[in-house]
């Protein structure tokens, strides 16, 4: 281990400029031991891109997700927060609905929402406003509702629930506060599940399967959870709620931050915006570069299931490891000029980022997030070519998420 360095993800410098803080830690000490402090447990921080990808994310069962992806343990044997064969089978329930052709089929709906949001912006007489509230927030939130099968009109409630759950997961809440929120959310999802069960009863279907999607049942992921089988059995009610929660918390904030960061970086250096307008073929490059340079999630945690070695150091059982996505995405061994935002960075290089993870816990919603960001840029450069950045709002309150509360822009 290198010479001890000071690092605290809760300090103002790290919160305000995570790229600089996490990059400096990687450069000085790619494997760092963070002692316990302020009621937080001790943990290790790994910032080396190759080791994170090979030894942790693709390294087999040693580094477990079962104790949660936050600093403090959140033990679960349900759904996505598991490992091994059951986890693979459970993921497949959702993955079957996110094939390339299935994701492509969502394009018209994404385009319709984007067009509606752009029209609403153009109707504002002042020609300026907060890009987050007008566009970056409602687009992924409404799409999440449609994909899950929840009422699209309720997207603001879903956003509020998502923000609250993320804060309570990654910060230091009062005991029982997480459960209090779930007591508001679970009855809502249970009602939607029961509505689908009633449709099956009305149609006389005793053994539903995937063929009933789009016929007896709406073709959405809540229905998919209801008719799918894992290890030759139906999903339990708790497992179905787990899928609903995964969509609620995973399908909004990260994509909002992706779209917000992307536009901010393009507008803060107007020559980038002009470059993209002149060459729209760089849209995919710009999306991947944004994911690399400004990862919506700065880091995740894993827990060691047994004694192991990492970065030539002995690691005890049940040790907490924070793998720094933000630090790895600035690794000069992988990315040329890693501290520069370049929309013409070659795609094969830019796509080496770890912002969606890798291995068995690779983000299932990554193709949808990419598509939403791509369509957003396509429409913005076409319909709002004179976009200008006026100001950047405050930082989101959850330290593991990198995003802002607003982006003041003008388009006249």
Model-derived features: positions:
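Cytochrome P450
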Residues: 1-412
């Amino acid at each position: 281990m290198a010479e001890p360095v000071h690092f605290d993800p809760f300090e103002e410098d790290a919160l305000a400029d995570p790229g600089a803080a996490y990059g400096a830690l990687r450069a000085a000490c790619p494997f760092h031991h963070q002692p316990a402090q302020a009621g937080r447990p001790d943990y290790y921080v790994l910032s080396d891109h190759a080791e994170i990808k090979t030894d942790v994310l693709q390294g087999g069962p040693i580094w477990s997700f079962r104790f949660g992806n936050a600093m403090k343990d959140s033990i679960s044997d349900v759904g996505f927060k598991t490992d091994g064969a059951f986890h693979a089978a459970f993921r497949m329930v959702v993955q079957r609905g996110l094939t390339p052709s299935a994701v492509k089929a969502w394009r018209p709906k994404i385009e319709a929402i984007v067009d509606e949001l752009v029209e609403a912006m153009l109707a504002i007489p002042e020609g300026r406003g907060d890009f987050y509230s007008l566009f970056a927030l409602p687009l992924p939130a409404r799409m999440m509702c449609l994909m899950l099968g929840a009422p699209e009109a309720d997207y603001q409630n879903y956003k509020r629930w998502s923000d609250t759950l993320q804060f309570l997961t990654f910060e230091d809440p009062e005991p029982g506060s997480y459960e209090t929120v779930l007591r508001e959310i679970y009855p809502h999802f249970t009602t939607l599940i029961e509505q689908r069960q009633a449709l099956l009863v009305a149609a006389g279907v005793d053994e539903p399967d995937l063929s009933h999607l789009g016929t007896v049942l709406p073709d959405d992921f809540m229905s998919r959870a209801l008719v799918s089988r894992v290890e030759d059995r139906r999903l339990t009610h708790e497992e179905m709620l787990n899928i609903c929660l995964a969509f609620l918390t995973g399908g909004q904030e990260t994509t909002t931050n992706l779209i917000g960061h992307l536009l901010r970086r393009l507008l803060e250096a107007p020559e980038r915006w002009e470059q993209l307008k002149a060459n729209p073929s760089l849209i995919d490059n710009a999306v991947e570069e944004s994911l690399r340079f400004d990862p919506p999630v700065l880091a995740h945690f894993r827990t060691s299931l047994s004694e192991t070695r990492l970065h030539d150091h002995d690691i005890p059982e049940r040790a907490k490891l924070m793998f720094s996505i933000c630090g790895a995405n600035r690794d000069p061994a992988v990315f040329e000029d890693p501290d520069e935002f370049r929309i013409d960075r070659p795609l094969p290089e830019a796509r080496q980022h770890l912002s969606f993870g890798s291995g068995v816990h690779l983000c299932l919603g990554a193709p949808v997030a990419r598509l939403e960001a791509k369509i957003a840029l396509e429409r913005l450069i076409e319909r709002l070519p004179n976009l200008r950045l006026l100001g950047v709002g405050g930082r989101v309150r959850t330290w593991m998420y990198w995003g802002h509360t607003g982006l003041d822009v003008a388009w006249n």
